[in-house]
C-alpha cells in the first residue's frame, strides 16, 4: 500500500493523492454476500430531506460483513482482500474449513493465505476474534462489541483501534481513539490488532467531482445564505457569524454536548472532553 501523488495534468489532478494497494482483489465481490443498496439521497419516507449534503453518486452494492465473528473453533483462510465502497476500511473474504465464506473488516498486517480463527481458544494474533476476558490487558484491539452477541460497533473505520486498559469483575475498560475511557462487558468480543488501510486519512480528494462520485453534495456556508435560510445569514458584504456559531436550527455548533443517553452514562468512565 502506497500514497501516490498524481501529476498536475489537469486542475482536478493537481494536488490529488491516492492510496494505491496492488494487493487488492480486482474482480467482482462474492455474490452470496452482496445485497442491493438503495440510495435514499438523504430523504425520509415522506420524501423530505433529513440529512443534508447527500445525493447522487455511483451505484453500490452492500457487502454483508460478519461483525459477530461467532463461528468458533473452525479455522478460516484469508482468500482475498477487497475494496469496499461502503466504508473506509478494506474487507477480507474468509473461507472456513467447512466451505462457508464470510467477509470481515481487514486487519492491518493480515495477508492472503493466512489462517484466522475466532472463539475463546483462538491464539492471540492479529485478525483473531476472542471475548475480551481472554485478551491480555494492554492489547490493541478493534471491532469491539458494546453488548455481547450484538456485533462489533467500536473501532471499525480504517486505521482505528482501541486499547484494553484493565479488567475489573464483569467489565473491562477501553481507551478509545477519541480519548474516552469506556466500560464494556468482558463477554463482548473484539478482534486483535488494528484496522488496516491506515493511510486512508492521508488521501486528498483533489476535485469536487470525486466527492460527487461518493454521493456527497456541496456544503454551503451559513454566512453565505440569507437570514431566512440560516441564523448566520444576511448582512451587507462579507460578514462573520455575529453570534455563537449554530446549526441551521439554532443548536450551538462547536463543542456543545448533545449526548442524551442517561441509560448508559455509567459505562463512560472518562469523557473525551477533559472539561
From Swiss-Prot:
One record GO biological process: cytoplasmic translation
Composition skew (Basic and acidic residues), residue ranges: 25-38, 229-241
UniProt KW keywords: Ribonucleoprotein, Ribosomal protein, RNA-binding, rRNA-binding
Stored Pfam families: Ribosomal_L2 (PF00181), Ribosomal_L2_C (PF03947)
UniProt key word Lipid biosynthesis: no
Listed SMART domains: Ribosomal_L2, Ribosomal_L2_C
InterPro entries from the UniProt entry: NA-bd_OB-fold, Rib_uL2_dom2, Ribosomal_uL2, Ribosomal_uL2_bac/org-type, Ribosomal_uL2_C, Ribosomal_uL2_CS, Ribosomal_uL2_dom3, Ribosomal_uL2_RNA-bd_dom
Subunit-level organization: Part of the 50S ribosomal subunit. Forms a bridge to the 30S subunit in the 70S ribosome.
Role noted for this protein: One of the primary rRNA binding proteins. Required for association of the 30S and 50S subunits to form the 70S ribosome, for tRNA binding and peptide bond formation. It has been suggested to have peptidyltransferase activity; this is somewhat controversial. Makes several contacts with the 16S rRNA in the 70S ribosome.
This protein's name: Large ribosomal subunit protein uL2
Species this chain originates from: Azoarcus sp. (strain BH72)
Amino acid at each position: 500500500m502506497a500514497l501516490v501523488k498524481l501529476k498536475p495534468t489537469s486542475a482536478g489532478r493537481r494536488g490529488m493523492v491516492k492510496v494505491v494497494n496492488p494487493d487488492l482483489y480486482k474482480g467482482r465481490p462474492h455474490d452470496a454476500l452482496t445485497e442491493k443498496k438503495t440510495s435514499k439521497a438523504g430523504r425520509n419516507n415522506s420524501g423530505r430531506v433529513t440529512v443534508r449534503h447527500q445525493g447522487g453518486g455511483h451505484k453500490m452494492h452492500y457487502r454483508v460483513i460478519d461483525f459477530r465473528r461467532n463461528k468458533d473453533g473452525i479455522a478460516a483462510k484469508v482468500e482475498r482482500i477487497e475494496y469496499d465502497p461502503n466504508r473506509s476500511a478494506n474487507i477480507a473474504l474468509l473461507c472456513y474449513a467447512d466451505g462457508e465464506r464470510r467477509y470481515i473488516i481487514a486487519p492491518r498486517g493480515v495477508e492472503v493465505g493466512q489462517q484466522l480463527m475466532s472463539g475463546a481458544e483462538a491464539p492471540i494474533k492479529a485478525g483473531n476474534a476472542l471475548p475480551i476476558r481472554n485478551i491480555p490487558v494492554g492489547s490493541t484491539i478493534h471491532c469491539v462489541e458494546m453488548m455481547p452477541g450484538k456485533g462489533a460497533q467500536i473501532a471499525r473505520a480504517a486505521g482505528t483501534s482501541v486499547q484494553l486498559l484493565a479488567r475489573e469483575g464483569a467489565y473491562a475498560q477501553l481507551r478509545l481513539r477519541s480519548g474516552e475511557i469506556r466500560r464494556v462487558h468482558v463477554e463482548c468480543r473484539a478482534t486483535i490488532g488494528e484496522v488496516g488501510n491506515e493511510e486512508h486519512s492521508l488521501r486528498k480528494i483533489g476535485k469536487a467531482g470525486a466527492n460527487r462520485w461518493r454521493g456527497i453534495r456541496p456544503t454551503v456556508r451559513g454566512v453565505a445564505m440569507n437570514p431566512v435560510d440560516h441564523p448566520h445569514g444576511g448582512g451587507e458584504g462579507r460578514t462573520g457569524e455575529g453570534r455563537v456559531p449554530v446549526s441551521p436550527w439554532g443548536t450551538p455548533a462547536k463543542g456543545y454536548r448533545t449526548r442524551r443517553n442517561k441509560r448508559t452514562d455509567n459505562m463512560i468512565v472518562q469523557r473525551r472532553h477533559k472539561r
